[in-house]
Curated annotation (Swiss-Prot):
GO terms for cellular component: cytosol; glycine cleavage complex. NCBIfam families: gcvT, PRK00389.1. This is Aminomethyltransferase. The lineage of its organism: Bacteria, Bacillati, Bacillota, Clostridia, Thermoanaerobacterales. It holds the Pfam family GCV_T. Coiled coil: none annotated. Its EC number is 2.1.2.10.
């Protein structure tokens, strides 16, 4: 573990019995108490996550808006000041360089929150595509910590620590310079769990203090510290993609089922031509949800079969703590992708029956 990157909270994990794993070169807790109990805490009360491994990149300057509008698939002209949106950066073949959140301060100032495994790649991609745009791009990931409080009790818990009325921060909006437990933070009503909640950004030196304050106040509400395991089962149930599983340089947003975040009518952007061609010609493969009929837990990489041939592979699979079923997502040949179709998942060399169902396994409980 010595050669892995660590967040400012690393020494605190031991106190909470964190089980540490290597995640994209970071030493991070996969669980504290247990994945299931942490998952259920977020669905029913609240969970506190250390997500300081995520990357933060600022884009500032006279042409920040035009630069980003060309770089991402979503339409920046629809984003208001103090609003956040989800988008993709694509390569010229339409594959996904990364999926990210864009925070807009103004047309000349944006904050991008990117996946930990892609920080250096994204930063290089942005600089390589800067061209003649008058912008300043800074990777500030090493200076910033991020905590996520997620679950139906998230607002109630955080409200105990601030005079700012958190109910005024609407879904996918943010407010800067919010004092939480006396610490100035950027707070957004965003998350990766399918529940209401907040993501809180602050300088590294305050991360431990804020974590402890939130744990202290949250106890009576049933808040638990939560690790990467629950973060993954929660996002998966809510139908949210994980880069490297449902998205990659080889998997386009259209194949992943996220055309909503690709705005073909906004003018030119990197990857547009390839994506438009794919849309017009029809998708050869797509990501589907499935539920196991036979007993077995599907896992990432398992083969999917139909008509005695391989038709794709599982991108994510779990026993769902909320639905109490074995379910998964798979990238398969489009001609087999209809709802209600029966497919086979090869588990321990044995083809087991599964049924294609909607990818939205769990109804999201966002406060809008």
């Amino acid at each position: 573990m010595d050669n892995l990157k660590k967040t400012p909270l690393f020494d605190l994990y031991k106190k909470y019995n964190g089980k540490i794993i290597d995640f994209a070169g970071w030493a991070l807790p996969v669980q504290f108490e247990s994945i299931i109990s942490e998952h259920e805490a977020v669905r029913n009360a609240a969970g506190l996550f250390d997500v300081s491994h995520m990357g933060e990149i600022t884009v500032k300057g006279r042409e920040a808006f035009n630069f980003l509008q060309n770089l991402i698939t979503n339409d920046l002209s629809k984003l208001k000041d103090n609003q956040v949106f989800y988008t993709f950066m694509c390569n010229y073949n339409g594959g996904v360089v990364d999926d990210l959140l864009v925070y807009k301060y103004s047309d000349e100032h944006f904050l991008l929150v990117v996946n930990a495994a892609n920080i250096e790649k994204d930063y290089k991609w942005m600089k390589d595509n800067k061209g003649v745009y008058e912008v300043e791009i800074n990777n500030i990931s090493d200076e910033i910590s991020e905590l996520a409080v997620q679950g139906p009790k998230a607002e109630e818990i955080l409200q105990k620590l601030t005079y700012t009325d958190l109910s005024e921060i609407k879904f996918f909006y943010f407010k800067d310079n919010v004092k939480i437990a006396g610490i100035e933070c950027l707070v957004s009503r965003t998350g990766y769990t399918g529940e209401d909640g907040f993501e809180i950004y602050m300088p590294n030196k305050y991360a431990v203090e804020l974590w402890e304050k939130i744990i202290e106040v949250g106890k009576e509400y049933g808040l638990k510290p939560a690790g990467l395991g629950a973060r993954d089962t929660l996002r998966f149930e809510a139908g949210l993609p994980l880069y490297g599983n449902e998205l990659s340089e080889e998997i386009t947003p259209l194949e992943a089922g996220f055309e909503f975040f690709v705005k073909f009518d906004k003018g030119n952007f990197i990857g547009k031509d390839a994506l438009l061609k794919q849309k017009e010609e029809g998708l050869k493969r797509k990501i589907v949800g499935f539920e196991m009929i036979d007993n077995g837990i599907p896992r990432h990489g398992y083969e999917v079969r139909a008509d005695n041939q391989k038709i794709g592979y599982v991108t994510t699979g779990y026993f769902s703590p909320t639905l109490k079923k074995n379910i998964g997502l798979a990238l398969i040949d489009s001609k087999y992708a209809q709802l209600g179709n029966q497919i086979e998942i090869v588990i321990r060399n044995k083809p087991l029956k599964a049924l294609i169902i909607s990818k939205n396994f769990y109804k999201k409980n966002y406060k809008k």
